């Protein structure tokens, strides 16, 4: 019997449509043919029900289902007893829970749909864990007995007896304006319980928007406002679900410092974050989550920050001796040797002149530069320094006011552009969209294997474009952008809405595609780990955001990063195992050493 329970059946509620099919799953099931009720479904039922006790894991129903609505997944054997929560029959289940410790920041890292938000809800006391018994849920006494002997027992006892107050900063900040009315200052005044309003507004740069209505805020401003609203209240448990989306590098670090400032000896702070360098900077320890998205999720034991992130990147949990991803990710040391004169001659293919552009009271000056084939140029700068403006001038969508230099014309480039904000207007399925926009590439086997397979576009093919989630839209937009034949690919924030695993995949896809297609890509990216992984050269933006900025000419990764980080006043070191960049804690020995040596970005170990 022990063998039988190690698999779970997942029936996707939005794909299973018994009215439109011939109940192939039930007709083909060998257990049903012997007269047992393994799969129960009638034309009138909403969903097929699969009994996990009777299922023998043959996988025939998975192949026969015309809508691909069924997954049968074999679980690791030792997971039978640790179920924390299951939403219903044939749905997602979560194993174990992350263990928060008072006075420390717990970071959670894992793919989307693997139970991070479920875990947050349970830890906030908003969702009562049912230990997998969704028909007869246990009472709290039994739940406490289940967790006895672990730190979670004390935690839940405190939640029940002391009525700990938990506040969650939601993941989707763009839904906030629907719920909150009024202007920023008023809302903060209502919530202010710690007399920190002035300090928080200065830290999170909210003073410019203090009189604005909440519904008129941009994404980044909403995010900072949401962080401020949580941080200004008094609570024992603070939870932040993705506090860095929409923010630029400087604001990410500011937000991280604000989150860390909430620590008190008996308070808990829990953060879900996909930008690994920010997570590294924020947390004191980390729990990874692995499993199958939408099917089951497992929380590992807590690790130290460095170990946890390295485990996640390596895709292997040593304590459980379990591999949860096929390939690991390491970072190359991207320092090109001095090129010889002939190579430079053959390389300098495209030039653009020095340009200026004024929009309203914002002035952007671009120094002349050149770039070559098979190169990825990453643009580094805060929000509002004119990165998108520069991209649009290269694309020929905006005319510069003034150009100077020997070749004053901007050469004509064929450009494929993925904008920062993606809004779905197409009234049909993803398949139609790809067919209409990029028919040639989407049929091409190399494009299939280089771009569409890794980004998992196949699963989205029959969904309506308007119903896609943020991350799914982002992947479709990336596919469309790379599928269009062009000389230059301009990609604005490819990591927004993607989870940490998809970011790794997306950066690999962009890199491989640019190398194979021998084209150039300009990428704007705020996730530091992605930016370092992608960049061959960097363009640094300096100046006052939204007032007067300068874009330097493309330079090598080392000198560019050094210049950029010196503006931000932070230093990076490299992790010895997989060479990922790690932020040094402010005023640590290493931080002071590197600042005095002037090497903010460390490449040589």
From Swiss-Prot:
GO terms for cellular component: cytosol; membrane. PANTHER family: ATP-BINDING TRANSPORT PROTEIN-RELATED (PTHR19248). ATP binds at residues 110-117, 381-388. Pfam families: ABC_tran, Fer4, Fer4_RLI. Induction: In plants undergoing RNA interference. Expressed in roots, stems, leaves, flowers and siliques. Residues 70-315, 344-568 form the ABC transporter domain. This is ABC transporter E family member 2. It comes from Arabidopsis thaliana (Mouse-ear cress). The lineage of its organism: Eukaryota, Viridiplantae, Streptophyta, Embryophyta, Tracheophyta.
């Amino acid at each position: 019997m022990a063998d039988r329970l190690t698999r779970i059946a997942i029936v996707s509620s939005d794909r299973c449509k018994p009215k439109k099919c011939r109940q192939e799953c039930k007709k083909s099931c060998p257990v049903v043919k012997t007269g047992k009720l393994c799969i129960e479904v009638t034309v009138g039922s909403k969903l097929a029900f699969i009994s996990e006790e009777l299922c023998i894991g043959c996988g025939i129903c998975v192949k026969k289902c015309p809508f691909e609505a069924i997954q049968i997944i074999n679980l690791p054997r030792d997971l039978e007893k640790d179920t924390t929560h299951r939403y219903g029959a044939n749905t997602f289940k979560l194993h174990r829970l992350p263990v928060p410790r008072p006075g420390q920041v717990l970071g959670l890292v894992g793919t989307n749909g693997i139970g991070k938000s479920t875990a947050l809800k349970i830890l906030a006391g908003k969702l009562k864990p049912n230990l997998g018994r969704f028909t007869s849920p246990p009472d709290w006494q039994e739940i406490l007995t289940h967790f006895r002997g672990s730190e979670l027992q004390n935690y839940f006892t405190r939640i029940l007896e002391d009525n700990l107050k938990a506040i969650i900063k939601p993941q989707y900040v763009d839904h906030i304006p629907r719920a909150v009315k009024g202007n920023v200052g008023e809302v903060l005044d209502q919530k202010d319980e710690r007399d920190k309003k002035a300090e928080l507004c200065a830290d999170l740069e909210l003073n410019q928007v203090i009189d604005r209505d909440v519904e008129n805020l941009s994404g980044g401003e909403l995010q900072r406002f949401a962080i401020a609203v949580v941080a200004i209240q008094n609570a024992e448990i603070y939870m932040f679900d993705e506090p860095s989306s929409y923010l630029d590098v400087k604001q990410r670090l500011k937000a991280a410092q604000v989150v860390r400032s909430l620590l008190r000896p008996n308070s808990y702070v829990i953060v879900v974050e996909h930008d690994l360098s920010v997570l590294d900077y924020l947390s004191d320890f980390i729990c990874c989550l692995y499993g199958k998205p939408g099917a089951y999720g497992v929380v590992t034991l807590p690790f130290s920050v460095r170990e946890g992130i390295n485990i996640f990147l390596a895709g292997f949990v040593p304590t459980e001796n379990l591999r949860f991803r096929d390939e690991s990710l390491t970072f190359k040391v991207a320092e090109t040797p001095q090129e010889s004169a002939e190579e430079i001659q053959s390389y300098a293919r495209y030039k653009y002149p020095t340009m200026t552009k004024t929009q309203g009271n914002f002035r952007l000056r671009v120094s002349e530069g050149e770039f070559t084939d098979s190169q990825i140029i990453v643009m580094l700068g805060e929000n509002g320094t004119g990165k998108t403006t520069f991209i649009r001038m290269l694309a020929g969508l905006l005319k510069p006011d003034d150009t100077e230099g020997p070749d004053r014309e901007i050469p004509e480039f064929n450009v494929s552009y993925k904008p920062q904000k993606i809004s779905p207007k197409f009234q049909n399925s993803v398949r139609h969209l790809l067919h209409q926009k990029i028919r040639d590439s989407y049929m091409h086997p190399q494009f299939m294997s280089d771009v569409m397979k890794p980004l998992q576009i196949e699963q989205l093919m029959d969904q309506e474009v308007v119903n896609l989630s943020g991350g799914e839209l982002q992947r479709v937009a990336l596919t469309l952008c790379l599928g269009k034949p062009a000389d230059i690919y301009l990609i604005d924030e490819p990591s927004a809405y993607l989870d940490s695993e998809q970011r790794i995949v997306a950066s690999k896809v962009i890199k491989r595609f640019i190398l194979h297609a021998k084209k150039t890509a300009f990428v704007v990216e705020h996730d530091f780990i992605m930016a370092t992984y992608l960049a061959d050269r960097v363009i640094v933006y300096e100046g006052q955001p939204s007032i007067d900025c300068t874009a330097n000419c493309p330079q090598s990764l080392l000198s560019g990063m050094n210049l950029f980080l010196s503006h931000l006043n932070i230093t990076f070191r490299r992790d010895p195992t997989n060479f990922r960049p790690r932020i040094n804690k402010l005023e640590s020995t290493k931080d002071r050493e590197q600042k005095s040596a002037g090497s903010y970005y460390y490449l040589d170990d």
